[in-house]
């Protein structure tokens, strides 16, 4: 089997059988079976996901991570390997991430069998990147405590960059992602007796207006921030004063101070609702993913790896506003995360992440494995000096 046949077969199987965050049971079995066939030892610290390990000719250990979960999206691609799971799709490319790491495991096992693997390697097939914070769950479960990991590397496919280009950036490359929720509780009445109630309709309208102005009036316009209102509702009938209201959304920023400003303003908005509308209002925050921080000390390995794998390196001036739970790995070791271009206009592979038409050429997965291998060589050369 050629490497192109390998990545095509595995990627398309995974694409046809996507599973949501924390439900990647069959995906986990598939990866485990692959590792069993290779004779690569592994552990399963959580119900889903796999941590594999190979010993090399060194005391140094590095790690590579691929996320394995999918999204609740109905696939609209008209391809033979279209998702067979209703309203679940690998719309963020994690099937590709997983397959590229599988190929790299296979290469490393071949090196290890010949006594030529230069470093110890931890291969992280991580569950629940989209929701659930799988990286943090693994860390809290002690999955890496026995591995003296010195560096962690990861990638993400990027359909807005042409195939063959890779976006890198030192320090923050993705934003933090924090969810917020407003809960409003008033008093219902018939619309004809509106004065007898305390309407959450007008109160929610006030909240929407004020939240919508936070970015304009309280944050530095030169910085890239998002205060997004994703879902809101109030009331149940057209002739009733709404007794409840609800708003939820997300905050994206790569500046901790800006996040605190947004939280403070939302708290003030919540407090103002009681005074203006006699409606109880509470805002709650759910801390999501911190910014992904790329350690500048690892840049030389990343750049060497990309150039030697014949990628064009693009240095991004500002971070993406995506949330990415790879950020948690910086708690255990220096880490570096890059975005690999997969755009192919000739084939119509142009739609963004989290869309129903996301697709890419499987051949790019071989080049990602090449990049992983070149990082291994670069890191080994420095450690041997």
Curated annotation (Swiss-Prot):
Protein name (Swiss-Prot/TrEMBL): Uncharacterized hydrolase SSP1352
SUPFAM superfamilies referenced in this protein's UniProt entry, alphabetically: Bacterial exopeptidase dimerisation domain (SSF55031), Zn-dependent exopeptidases (SSF53187)
Source species taxonomy: Bacteria, Bacillati, Bacillota, Bacilli, Bacillales
Family: Belongs to the peptidase M20 family.
Keyword Protein biosynthesis: no
GO terms assigned for molecular function: hydrolase activity
A Pfam family hit: M20_dimer
InterPro entries: Amidohydrolase (IPR017439), Bact_exopeptidase_dim_dom (IPR036264), Peptidase_M20 (IPR002933), Peptidase_M20_dimer (IPR011650)
EC number: 3.-.-.-
Keywords for the protein's UniProt record, in alphabetical order: Hydrolase
UniProt xrefs under PANTHER family: METALLOPEPTIDASE, PUTATIVE (AFU_ORTHOLOGUE AFUA_6G09600)-RELATED (PTHR11014:SF63), PEPTIDASE M20 FAMILY MEMBER (PTHR11014)
